């Protein structure tokens, strides 16, 4: 097992094997080969995949696949599907080109852009903490945390956030708080800073507020949480809210114990075996930690999006001749704010990419960030021809960031699992999230059409136009995921819930292409209602699978 330098996080699983080729006398031969994650060994039509290994790491488990013809045939099918989808988009006689040239939509730019896509002092309630100058200098010191070299500010911020639910505590910086715990734990253990949101657990612990100290959770040598535990982690048994709160509180206590034992944060080894971060990366991570990009942007985008949506409905209910110069100035203001929001989100996403050293698409938090970025980009591209994409961009990006915030998706930057280190994964996730963003636009487009009936036909044409790249992005993302699965595990399809629901989504939206066979889709009202209802399959694919069905693709808690 190869590890990331200075950490215990696996970077790759590698097996060294010797192949014996049977023969007679001098004709027999052998050779040494290597198998690892996403690196297949092919020998005489057999493909060997790294699967697992023994606990003592003395033996390796390999998956063997023999399908000499199937891979070529399958890949040719994927290529033909991709060529046909591109052909539909660029065919001069195709429906997509006809929709682009429709008089109701021909009012602005070209939609081909769719494809671009310690010294101690006493402060605050006599708590012993570092002075602010020492704390600030400590913030940029490099340590190993969660199997990654980071500035000290990162574990300090995560520690305070995990315990209190906030980025700071009692007016103290995260470095001051964690410094106090490291230097004077006998004082800080009496400080009520462990946030417990479950009222029943607070009552059982005799707490007057929603915050407990470490001493509140111990009665001498007895750990009080054990008295309330009912075994909610038994297989097949769902935990009650009280048991979930006990587990969450226990994790917070464990975090404090890990800090005191020295296992939560480790200094860089002095032998130089771990390469420190560059000064630019340290500064970038400090900026990323100190600016709450997601929290600021979801509140801002939802607020501005609602204002822009109400303004859009107000203008839509009036005739063009009645629209004032003030309305046009307000529209230009919303557009300027849209570009600013996009650049702010791009800055946050780019910083995360630069700090992590990889494209941020490995967990639920990062994919929602990418979806928010995609919706803002699409709104910027379409806003000249379709002004209503401006409020849509604000609202969709705001909801995406809100879901990431409320769902408590893990915002920590961690090394990638070996199986995720693949360019196929990045393309797979990027295409699918682009399709989800377009489907979300179509859903809001349907809602707007129900509010402003007289624009129903034009909005239906727009949704039909977006349907082509949206469903094609989803289809391309599905078969790129199949290629990635074949490279990693030796199979294209495993009937995992996420795979099945992605296929269901692809088929549900695919029905809307068949206007001749299904004449109901020619009626704007039916079409818009169908697009709104179809978006439920997207929600099920992304959120329902993560939180309800589970499976290999589930990263609700990632």
Please give the residue ranges for each predicted region.
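Solvent-exposed, non-transmembrane regions of integral membrane proteins
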Residues: 1-558
């Amino acid at each position: 097992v190869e590890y990331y330098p200075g950490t215990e996080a696996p970077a790759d699983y590698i097996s060294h094997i010797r192949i014996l080729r049977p023969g007679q006398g001098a004709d027999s031969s052998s050779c040494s080969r290597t198998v690892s994650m996403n690196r297949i060994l092919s020998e005489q039509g057999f493909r060997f995949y790294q699967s697992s290994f023994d606990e003592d790491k003395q033996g390796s488990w390999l998956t063997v696949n023999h399908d000499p013809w199937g891979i070529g045939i399958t890949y040719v099918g994927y290529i033909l599907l991709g060529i046909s989808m591109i052909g539909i988009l660029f065919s001069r006689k195709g429906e997509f080109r006809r929709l682009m040239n429709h008089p109701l939509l021909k009012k602005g730019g070209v939609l081909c852009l769719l494809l671009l896509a310690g010294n101690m002092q006493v402060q605050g309630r006599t708590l012993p903490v570092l002075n602010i100058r020492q704390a600030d200098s400590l913030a940029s010191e490099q340590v190993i945390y969660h199997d990654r070299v980071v500035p000290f500010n990162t574990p300090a911020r995560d520690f305070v956030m995990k315990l209190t639910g906030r980025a700071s505590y009692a007016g103290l910086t995260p470095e001051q708080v964690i410094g106090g715990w490291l230097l004077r734990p006998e004082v800080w253990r009496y400080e009520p800073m462990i946030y417990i949101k479950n009222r029943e657990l607070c009552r059982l612990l005799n707490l007057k507020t929603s915050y407990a100290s470490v001493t509140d959770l111990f009665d001498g040598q007895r750990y009080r949480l054990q008295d309330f535990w009912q075994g909610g982690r038994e297989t097949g048994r769902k935990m009650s809210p009280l048991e979930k709160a006990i587990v969450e509180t226990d994790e917070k206590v464990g975090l404090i114990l890990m800090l005191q034992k020295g296992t939560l944060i480790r200094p860089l080894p002095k032998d130089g075996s771990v390469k420190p971060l560059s000064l630019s990366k340290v500064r970038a991570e400090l900026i990323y930690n100190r600016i709450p990009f997601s929290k600021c942007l979801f509140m801002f985008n939802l607020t501005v999006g609602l204002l822009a949506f109400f303004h859009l409905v107000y203008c839509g209910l009036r005739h063009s001749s009645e629209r004032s110069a003030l309305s046009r100035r307000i529209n230009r203001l919303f557009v300027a704010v849209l570009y600013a929001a996009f650049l702010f989100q791009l800055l946050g996403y780019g910083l995360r990419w630069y700090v992590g050293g990889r494209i941020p698409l490995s967990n639920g938090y990062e994919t929602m960030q990418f979806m928010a970025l995609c919706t803002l980009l699409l709104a910027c591209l379409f806003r000249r021809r379709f002004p209503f994409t401006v409020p849509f961009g604000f609202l969709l990006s705001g909801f995406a960031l809100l879901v990431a915030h409320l769902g408590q998706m893990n915002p920590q930057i961690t090394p990638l699992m070996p199986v995720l280190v693949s360019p196929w994964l990045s393309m797979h996730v990027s295409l699918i999230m682009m399709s989800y963003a377009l489907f979300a636009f179509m859903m809001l487009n349907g809602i707007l059409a129900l509010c402003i009936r007289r624009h129903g036909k034009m909005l239906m044409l727009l949704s039909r136009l977006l349907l082509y790249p949206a469903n094609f992005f989803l289809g391309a993302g599905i078969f790129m995921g199949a290629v990635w699965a074949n490279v990693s595990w030796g199979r294209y399809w495993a009937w995992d819930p996420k795979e099945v629901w992605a296929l269901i989504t692809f088929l549900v939206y695919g029905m809307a292409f068949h206007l001749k066979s299904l004449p109901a889709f020619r009626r704007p009202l039916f079409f818009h209602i169908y697009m709104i209802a179809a978006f439920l399959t997207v929600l099920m694919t992304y959120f329902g699978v993560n939180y309800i069905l589970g499976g290999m693709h589930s990263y609700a808690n990632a």
